[in-house]
Amino acid sequence: VSSPAAVPWRRLLSWLQRLWLRLPLMDRWLTGELLGPLLFGIAAFTAVSLSVGVVFELVRKVAEAGLPPLVAMQVLGLRLPGFLVLSFPMATLMATLLGYSRLSGSSELTALRSIGVSTRRMVMPALSVALLMTALTFVFNDVIVPSANLAAADTLDTALGRALASERGDNVVYSRFGRIKIQDGDGERNARALAQLFYARRFREGEMEDVTLLDFSRPGQQQMLIAQTAVWNEARSMWEFRNGRIVNIAVEGNRTTSAQFDRYFYPFTAAPLEVGKLPSDAAQMTVGQALRAERLLREAGDGKEARRLRVRIQEKFAFPAICLVFGLIGSSLGVRPNARTSRSQGFGISVLLIFGYYLMSFIFSSLGVKGTLLPFFSAWLPVFIGLAGGLYLLRQASR
């Protein structure tokens, strides 16, 4: 008797089998020819990137820090999705290039042309596989990878005896801008400027540690607040600073007053708490977390960081589309008449194309962060250029 949990999976597999059998025989045959090179490409590129990115680091921790080998294997498995998702676009390029090159070299594509099958029709299975890999890449990148990387970090910290916290962050910085009175040669005037700057060296389980707050919002006076810890008091909607010192500096006369305190309530936004809960690296955020972080930065008046994050958000959507670009380019190159590409040649061509594409993406991303290009165009222009190049190659192959 099958368990209730297995019933949905059986239904899904049955539905996929029926869908597969409904496809034309030619599409099933061409798709089957792509699966072998696709799996080989995923395995090859994942093994290379995983070895360089994490294996050497774990081996060093096993040898020097006494990390148990079983825990190292567990961390390796949790880090695997992050490197697996990087291999999807590269494997798509390699699979389409090798698969169609082999069929072209054995004159099987020539036989299809002889019965009236167009080149565009031949590459449709490759584009379907590329679209499937695009969707899979987005799901991995947004759902699986962030949680897997967090679990890997927690597992490693636990094994090495570090403090484990579900909410944690380092170097939490939040700046708030506003209209404040500024004194100059013409007297006082209202201008938009930095009003408060909040900094905490560490954030653990809702508590900020080694906190410094600078307040420039009061005319003729600057205030600095230093505390060992700070927590958000929900009842008062204020920050509760503990075990610290408050220093007031009068601009005129350079007078300074200082006082120590055990507890001090300061009216400030809870935004630093949200910032502390977010991953510090945009690459480790989900789309929802990145949108929330961008909103916080925009509200804080940090235009440069907000723009950088808007670029990263667009890149989270544009990165999976690389599979479609590489699928179109690879199939267009492989479908050419008498195209013969060995596995080693396909690997080399794939590496060159991948390097060129990522170099172009890096350049456009830098222009977007600087503000030269809009975030949308900085992320999507490489995709549009790649698609245009792939369509040109497909047109050349159709002649």
Question: What is each PLM-predicted segment?
Answer:
Residues S3-R28, V62-L70, E299-G303:
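Short, membrane-interfacial amphipathic segments enriched in basic
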Residues W29, E33-P37, R121-T134:
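Start (N-cap) of specific transmembrane helices in multi-pass transporter permeases
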Residues L80-G99:
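Long, hydrophobic alpha-helical segments
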Residues T96-T110, I115:
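Transmembrane helix boundary and interhelical loop/hinge segments in multi-pass membrane proteins
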Residues R113-S118, G371:
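Short helix-to-coil transition segments within interhelical loops
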Residues A130-N254:
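Non-transmembrane, extracytosolic/lumenal segments of membrane-associated proteins
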Residues V275-G301:
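Extended, hydrophilic extramembrane loops/domains of integral membrane proteins
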Residues K304-A397:
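Transmembrane alpha-helical segments that form the functional core of multipass membrane systems
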